[in-house]
């Protein structure tokens, strides 16, 4: 079946509508809040009308039917449909702030209870429990530090690569700002020599030639690159065979400016051609 389906789920307030707008801009036929029990019939109907790219968003308001989604997606894959799953998430404090700023109520906050509306943190905890099976199957996007324009850009980048191959997302980050929630693998490179302590390199980044030359001369850096690359070489085929569309490899150093950026650039270059690759520098790009 010549059809690609993108299913967007995630926490309320995480940016699902923004992600859906990105897909609409990219030419997908989009439906928001589709009841899960209608997913298969909707996809088949759209294909009958010669549609080739479809995107649907689902949220916790359809909680009773959400357990049907994994089985339906498996059935679509058996028919030859290219299925991609995105799960948008953010830290609880960010979600609370967004609800406060927009003055919107959480979809589960008005569930009928004798003691009245549920507290926001309680409903968020319940929502995470209900959505956990879908999160496990999807590519997670942590929107905690993303502006709407950055989320739009990132989703478009993800969907710009062919769905038939595994996509590797290499991301640099600063440990002092926290580990991103969307990482599948996290490598700590803070033990490597730090260009920050070289006065002429401090203001530069891991993409600048002087920093690249400095790090290339460090045996520990070369060894770390080899070990991470060999680990990925060993396991990526198995991940691809397990219907994984995306794998996010996060490389962290103290400031997210020199060492992690350099390693991300080198690893992405190593795997380009064999796999789809994307590069994200969280601290440099403001994401």
Swiss-Prot record:
It comes from the Bacteria. GTP binds at residues 59-62. One of its GO terms (molecular function) is ATP binding. Keywords: ATP-binding, GTP-binding, Nucleotide-binding. It holds the Pfam family RapZ-like_N. ATP binds at residues 10-17. HAMAP family: RapZ_like (MF_00636). PANTHER family: RNASE ADAPTER PROTEIN RAPZ (PTHR30448:SF0). Belongs to the RapZ-like family. This is Nucleotide-binding protein Dtpsy_0831. It comes from Acidovorax ebreus (strain TPSY) (Diaphorobacter sp. (strain TPSY)). The lineage of its organism: Bacteria, Pseudomonadati, Pseudomonadota, Betaproteobacteria, Burkholderiales.
